[in-house]
């Protein structure tokens, strides 16, 4: 029996209006996931209802865990640094501060909530980005 690999941290950022799309994205990730990997799903948010959180927790399985990270306090601490515009929501900025908010995590994947996953994220996570701070896909 193969031993499962370390957890792969995957981050989403959304609000209560967008969490349903996050759930579709997560389901597509689960549909293509390696059974040998463990995926730790972090949902960065300021206002996801308990009802929607329960629905997303119900998606957990042996390979996927979900945690909701309420980032309102952190957001208030950096708000003066953020140029807010009509076309940028606060959740747009969460991805920029993942490394600062989670210093215990050395490497992670961020995915937009409206992305459909067509391959296994374990392969993407295994890719060596060297000393680069960010790696990106199209």
Predicted regions mapped to residue ranges:
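Short, surface-exposed connector motifs at secondary-structure boundaries
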Residues: 35-40, 105-107
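N-proximal low-complexity "stem/linker" segments adjacent to membrane-targeting elements
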Residues: 1-27, 31
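A structural signal for isolated positions on well-ordered beta-strands in alpha/beta enzyme cores
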Residues: 9-11, 40-42, 67-69, 109
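Active-site catalytic pocket residues across diverse enzymes, especially alpha/beta-hydrolases
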Residues: 33, 60, 128
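GT-A fold catalytic core of metal-dependent nucleotide-sugar glycosyltransferases
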Residues: 72, 76, 91-138
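Active-site-proximal specificity loops/subdomain of glycosyltransferases
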Residues: 51-101
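A short acidic (Asp/Glu
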Residues: 21-23, 51-55, 121
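Short internal beta-strands
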Residues: 39-47, 136
């Amino acid at each position: 029996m193969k031993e499962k690999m370390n957890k792969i941290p995957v981050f989403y950022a959304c609000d209560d209006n967008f969490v349903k799309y996050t759930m579709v994205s997560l389901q597509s990730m689960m549909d293509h996931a390696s059974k040998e990997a463990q995926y730790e799903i972090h949902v960065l948010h300021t206002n996801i209802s308990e009802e929607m959180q329960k629905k997303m927790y119900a998606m957990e399985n042996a390979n996927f865990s979900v945690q909701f990270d309420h980032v309102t306090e952190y957001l208030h601490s950096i708000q003066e640094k953020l140029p807010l515009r009509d076309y940028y929501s606060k959740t747009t900025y969460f991805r920029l501060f993942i490394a600062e908010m989670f210093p215990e995590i050395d490497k992670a994947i961020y995915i937009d909530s409206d992305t459909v996953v067509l391959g296994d994220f374990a392969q993407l996570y295994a890719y060596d980005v060297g000393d680069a701070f960010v790696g990106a896909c199209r």
